[in-house]
Amino acid sequence: MNRRGLTIAIGFALSLSALPAAADPADTVILETLDKISARVSRVEVPVGTTITFGSLKITPRHCDKRPPEETPESSVFIEIIEELPDAQPKLEFSGWMFASSPALSALDHPVYDVWVVDCKNASTSAIETTP
């Protein structure tokens, strides 16, 4: 290998060590919901792939990532929110990524309800951590 090739190989190897750590997938999403009519705020834990009902909304988190502790804190969730009203076809209100650190970046735009991501966690590790 010539000198230039060696320099490129070393530079590439060093750049890999500077990349941020990959986010860890989690199995549970922590959401907060707001009913704007009653001003009631609720915190809900939803397993990924499970649908919950909040008012007329059906909320289904599809994927949840949480950055490792050595990185800047961030939880990101791919979520689908469908509104089901009586005598109407279900309407997709939101489908996309929501970020715990920036709730306004990709928010649900609904006149009655707000939904935002608080965190992601693994239910199995949480049970172990809380055991005395």
Q: What is each residue range found by the language model?
A:
Residues 2-5, 19-132:
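N- and C-terminal low-complexity/disordered segments
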Residues 9-17:
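Bacterial N-terminal signal peptides
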